[in-house]
Amino acid sequence: MASGRLIKLVIFELLEFAAFSIPTLVIMEQFATAYQRTRNASEKTHYWLIVSCSIAYVAVVSLLIWVPVKVLLHKKRHLYKKIKGWRPVMMMCVVLTTLPSFIFSIAVTEVQKTINTTVDVLPDTLPDLPVSLVISSLIITDIIEKLRFHPIRGYQKSNEDKHIHTSSLQQVRTVTEQVRQNGENAASPCAASPSETWQPPGALTHSAVPMFAGPQEPFFGSGILKTMSRRDVRAEIFLWSFLLWSDTIEMVRVAGHPNVYKTNWLYPVYLFSFISLLRIIFTPQNPLLSCLGILLQDLPFVFVRLSLIIALGTITPVLGLCKNVLVTLSYVYFNFLTRFRAFSNFELSPF
């Protein structure tokens, strides 16, 4: 009987291969259908030629790149120690699947423009399935790569739960130490002279600042509230993996607007959407992810969304533009401007 680890490995590999191959086949079939309309409708030669080329591409890439890399990483596990900061599987998905899919999605639109000779007779919106399938497959592959390091069965606490529990212990320990220090000070009234203990107002230490600047997080030990407060780290992987790419998903959906895909605005929207997806190549705990999130997504999206709003109106949500602007400004302020003297004054008030 197969072990649970082997079953998990087989299921994960099959899901990843499906996410790697299916988007390319779907996009290429859509391109073949659009291209066939430019030819004789009774003949399917061009259609089947393009479909067969897409199948051949997936087969060649899988046999020459995907399978060898997968086998090498599985057999030579020590190679993971030499790979720092990025993930080979996600690199293959982005370069070999996502990039061709985006290119042929643009090609489908161009072929439709060639068929109709005018943009006025084009469909009102682009089909959402192909592009959504590409991004969903990429996110699913990312989730699988994260779940490899977690067991499928059993219960695992969320990291945030552990942080709250640790913070509570630290707060209890701090209060106990303060009470003990107050007792020692009261027991020794013969302290140092005022000239030795006096400090100027600007020389207050960090311990003088109140520790509890906000409301405390509740903790439920039993009952229905404990059941409702359960958070498993594996479920949160699914949640945050989709939330992380919601901005890119919204930007890609803008490409389906008739005022975008019927004009040259389609190119910058797809280009910067693909650039933002490059962040998925890096490991989840990479220290460069915050900076890359600004450089590859938020900052470019500010200019793209602002240009779209100025040229075409509010076809992209203003909330998305506000998010990109605020995230970019907050990153620059808290990471760089606060290092200057004018922004580095110590705050005595917790409010």
From Swiss-Prot:
Signal peptide: none annotated. GO terms for cellular component: membrane. It is a multi-pass membrane protein. It is found in: Membrane. It comes from the Eukaryota. The chain crosses the membrane at residues 9-29, 49-69, 88-108, 121-141, 264-284, 301-321. InterPro entries: Uncharacterised_FAM23-like_TM. Keywords: Glycoprotein, Membrane, Transmembrane, Transmembrane helix. Intestine. Belongs to the TMEM236 family. This is Transmembrane protein 236. It comes from Oryctolagus cuniculus (Rabbit). The lineage of its organism: Eukaryota, Metazoa, Chordata, Craniata, Vertebrata.
